[in-house]
Amino acid sequence: MHVRVRLFAMQRELAATREVALELEPGATIESAWDALVGLNPLLGPGRAAVRFARNGAYADATDVLEEGDELAFIPPVSGGAPDSEDTPGRDTRSGAGAARRIIELRATAFGPAILDDLADRLATPADGAVVAFLGRTRETPGTPAPGQEVEARRHAGRAVDELEYEAHETMALAVLGTIADEIAARFGVQRLAIVHRLGAVPLGEASIAVVAVSPHRDAAFGAARYAIDETKARAPIWKAERFEDGHVWVGAPARTGPADVEG
């Protein structure tokens, strides 16, 4: 049985390749595919505790049995972590909460200065009285290194970040963002939402993510925007490297494969 493994971020660097073809016995599981990969690339082995699995573009369990031609991704720690608040504002169930509109994008080019206004204009209807927008920017202060990156982080301790660089499993990332939008509609009743994320190099002070939630009422819009950014950072297969003059550090935490209050 033949399967294809795609490698990203720190795994890609450790293995010095973006893709590996594996030949496995019939009935092999995702876990056994990981073991075979580590057999070919032993440097990947210490990262097992922080790895999450994906099969054909969706999160999967280590015990899932593989089929001929499957595409696997062993997801290293993603760009963010779990939310720092468990507040859950109310759901918008009042009139005018319909008319679903979504903007889910990954962009390789810089955002314009009016991106939040542009997104709000594309989403809002006459029934909407609330627009909540979030813009994430590159800061000079380093973040928390991903598991396995601690030594490299210490080498750059005390230095300012020059720029960020983002990498993604693009088709899977778009699917995860769409799922997050579905959850927002179910939890908060917010049907008009934008999540736009940069890829590639993002210099100091430039924006890397824009989130806009539009609703008739503010409580639902605030909750939707917060949920969108927290879940994107925790679950989307998007990786972030902090770049310095003489090297880089991958930052983040092991990916969550579902909502924090459901994953168990």
What label would you give each PLM region?
Residues 29-32, 219-223:
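Short, conserved charged micro-motifs
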